[in-house]
Amino acid sequence: MRIIRFEESSGFVLAAVTDEQQVFPLPHSDFMELVRESEQQQTTPLRLVQEMMTSVQPLEKKLEDLTLLVPLEAAEVWACGVTYERSREARNYEATGGKMDSATFYDKVYDAKRPEIFFKSTAARTVGPNQDVYLRSDSNWQIPEPELGLVLTREGKIVGYTAGNDMSCRDIEGENPLYLPQAKMWRGSCSIGPSIRLAETVSDPYAFEIICRIYRDGEKVVDGSANTSQLKRKYEELVEYLVRDNSLFDGTVLLTGTCIVPPDDFTLADGDRIEIEISGIGILTNPVKSQATKNISI
Ligand code: DO4
Ligand code: MG
């Protein structure tokens, strides 16, 4: 069972639930409203949507014909780093100029009790399915980071799973780790979607298959896959550090780190198309644009 948000031709935004065959509109403005109503009714989001599906007509349009939006407008997106061996290896490569000759703080954080967690994005910087992600104009080495996202209540309860892209500049971070916020955060540097999978419908959250494909001029130039079984840490451990002495917004998204890194000689280019597919969540597709073509004001 997956929750989506979409825009009607009138411009009206609706949340909806899909069982893959059909799409049923929900009377909620977004996923967190559904979660809160289920709490008030002392039921679960799954039971609530199942009940609603018996009393509303499905849309005439199919899922693939809808204009999807971010599945929730997360006020904050946070992200974890170096939670997979592949990320540690890639970070060491960029920090040592490819020499990999000495232990780094990335080795340290991979093994440390405290995970790396950083602030990634705000609602205004985050885009949804089929919307453009943007390249930084002062970086020559940029990649998508395909990651599983945890959807959290303000108490830190995991109520859903989504897919996310932690767009990153390997040259800026590699030059100096203190540049991390600049390597990670700019307009259009984060995407989430296409849906939220209800947590209670996932029997093993350490068995998500993650696939990343990048297309250039119609050709597939990157094709990588990974599985959340390779994650070094537990989700509860990551959330525990995020909520510690912190206040969360309802619907905060926590990206759990990347295990797919394109080849070291690869950098994203204007016109590329990124696809991030997570089993049971769907395909998050984003065209890549250079900042020169963007016209926004945040
Ligand atoms: O240490 C930098 C961040 C690494 C990261 O974003 C990841 O592992 O996904
Ligand atoms: Mg990342």
Each language-model region and where it sits:
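Short, acidic/polar N-cap/turn motifs at the starts of alpha helices
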Residues: M1-I3, F12-V13, E147, E209-I211, ...
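Buried hydrophobic positions in well-ordered alpha/beta secondary-structure cores of metabolic enzymes
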Residues: I3, A15-A16, G81, L150, ...
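Catalytic-pocket segment enriched in acidic/His residues
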Residues: S9, R170-I298
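A generic structural motif
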Residues: D30, N165, N227-T228
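Active-site microenvironments in enzyme catalytic cores
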Residues: R47-R216
